[in-house]
Amino acid sequence: MEYGALNHVAFTPGKEMLVITDLKSGRLKYYSIDGHYVKSVKLPYWFSRCEFITDNLIAGFWSGGTVIPGENKNYKPLLVVTDLLGNISSSAFQSYYRKEYTSTIFEPIRKFEDRVLYNNPNTDSIFLLTPNGIELAYHLNIKGAKPMIINEDITNDLLREQRRNNPFFNGDFVELKDGAIFHIFESGFPGYRFGIYSNAKQRTFCCDCFRYSPFFCFFDAPKARYGDNTVVVDTRSDIVLAYKDELYKLGKKEEIDEFYKDLTEDS
């Protein structure tokens, strides 16, 4: 069975299956790892992003908020934790979405190993989602930043004004085995800024854009985790080609030449 829209892809907790959030059909489509259709389950609520906390418990996000049966109709949480039958265990973070305010982030819910994490769009806090509730996992105290004020009066124009000359966390982060990395964005700033939190040191190390390793020539916002402590980024092939000589400074010419083998600007 084909899906109508590929809104989000998640693993089941044991990674036996891939699950596509298909808003066009309003269903979760289950596939085996090799791509064979397994089953389809009705979405309990209108979610554009879903991650599995357990086999029967999902965290769902919708930028317009979710109307919860039996609750105040004005309460429309961005985040809902529910079983597949629609029994809600947790919900939080009022949506202010409307014509004047449409800002969000691409991946508000992320999963690393068995930990499901949520970043409320345009804020500096990240929360851990569990069957027992929602708890603070990280709070970013960005040097020189003024906190964003997000309430019922917010508009796209007001948000842009708050972001002007103000560093902010834009939702790009990766949790690693021994820490986490967070992308910090600032309008007009010429370089890439990020913070690395160390579990062992229990402190954050900040990068202010000055690079001492050639790898940072094409380092960008973290997209995913690979293995225990490796961060995956994507960058254009022409940028990778432009910095080949910089990588030679590492002194591993044969390995670098193998890496660049068959790489072209059209790759």
Language-model features: where?
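Repeated scaffold domains used in trafficking and secretory/extracellular systems
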Residues: 4-10, 45-55, 99-108, 168-172, ...
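Surface loop/turn motifs at the tips and blade-to-blade linkers of beta-strand repeat domains
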Residues: 2-4, 40-45, 93-101, 139-142, ...
